[in-house]
Amino acid sequence: MRITTPVNPDGVQFPVWDRPDRFFFAPERHERHDLSRPGFFIRAEGIMTDIGRMAHVVPARTQLPVSAYFDEARFAREQELIFKQSSLYVGHQKLVPELGDWRTLVQEDGGRALVRNQRGVELVSNVCRHRQALMLGGEAGNVSGNANTRGSLKDTGGNIVCPLHRWTYNDRGELLGAPQFDATPCMNLQRFRLRDCHGLLFEGPRDPAADMAPLFARPEFDFGDYVLDHVEVHQCNYNWKTFIEVYLEDYHVGPFHPGLGRFVTCDDLAWEFNDWYSLQRVGVHQALAQPGSAVYKQWHDRLLDFRAGQAPDFGAMWVTYFPTHMIELYPHVLVLSTLYPKSPQETLNVVEFYYPEEIVAFEREFVEAQRAAYMETAIEDDEIAERMDAGRKALMLRGANETGPYQSPMEDGMQHFHEWYRRVMGETED
């Protein structure tokens, strides 16, 4: 993102978009600011500028037509132009922490699996080369669903063994034996290249470590002592872009989320934008003194108990690595949430919950309270997204198209996403 910084008569610089009809703060609306007070910050290409808390409306020139959320042809183009050209999150190394551990990819109905071997973590096909059966995971009546998705090769002598005919592969997918064949066929499992970004594993043509280098230079993004506690698989009956839009706007947090809206405050919202990601940081609402729901009260209480009554330094940090990977930081919590679009109106959300090892081992109530609060907000977000797509569908069916303005700074992240989307799709503004 490129910004310019014109100087007003008082000599104070204000960032302005590189087109005259798009701005964060117009010099003609200027009033003198005390730069020492908290405010809203936006960082772009190394520039950090205070532009105060003065909200304004930005014209909706980059928003998408209502048909974009339902069109099968567009969905197919997205697969080619976005998903095949991006870094796609596969899983974290900590999903398979011990030698011999395996975990099938639920987002692919178990068709591939992460396996930890002497070389590290590898991604291999979970489909036997003999009769193309799924091997690891699953159970009778649910062979490809979210059941029995992890285990250890120690149970099968360190090897991957097909349950149908006992074809046996080593932990790298190399065929060791095929019963009652005169010679072992040269038929190994396919392996897939992974790119490691501080333990997060991606595949695709981009380099996620380079894309997110400024992000992982921040001390908050060191998760060395965190361990996996739980993986939630959540079905979303709306378009993947709608999910990202809701995630990237804070305008609804106060009005729609009674629990989250009393856990965080958007009064000190700060954005950081980069070519392939955005980061939003929000503060703590009144030192957690007024929980907004019964579920969030449990989370407030457990968090304050763990911190001996001391309120945390921040409420949340929400990252979106385009197109669909989200890194969410809460006090003593890491959540990795990733969308896997299945159709224009069907999206799978796989959510991984990580905590410091000490909390997982000794603070079960903390873990359960945080996850319950998170899922309460997730269900509320589902309603927002479902209402948005239902309204868009109603407009589309009557042959109409409507888009509203962006509220700035609350919806700057949504605007940034729309700009990125149009760029990679090769589309111009409406």
Swiss-Prot record:
Its cofactor is [2Fe-2S] cluster. The keyword ATP-binding does not apply. SUPFAM superfamilies: Bet v1-like, ISP domain. It is an enzyme of class 1 (oxidoreductase). The keyword Iron-sulfur applies. PROSITE patterns: RIESKE. InterPro entries: Rieske_2Fe-2S, Rieske_2Fe-2S_sf, Ring_hydroxy_dOase_asu_C_dom, Rng_hydr_dOase-A. Keywords: 2Fe-2S, Iron, Iron-sulfur, Metal-binding, Monooxygenase, Oxidoreductase. CDD domains: RHO_alpha_C, Rieske_RO_Alpha_N. Its EC number is 1.14.-.-. GO terms for molecular function: 2 iron, 2 sulfur cluster binding; iron ion binding; monooxygenase activity. [2Fe-2S] cluster binds at C128, H130, C162, H165. It holds the Pfam family Ring_hydroxyl_A. It comes from the Bacteria. Binds 1 [2Fe-2S] cluster per subunit. Residues 88-203 form the Rieske domain. Belongs to the bacterial ring-hydroxylating dioxygenase alpha subunit family. Rieske-type iron sulfur protein that can catalyze in vitro the 2-hydroxylation of putrescine, forming 2-hydroxyputrescine. May be involved in the biosynthesis of the cyclic hydroxamate siderophore alcaligin. This is Putrescine 2-hydroxylase.
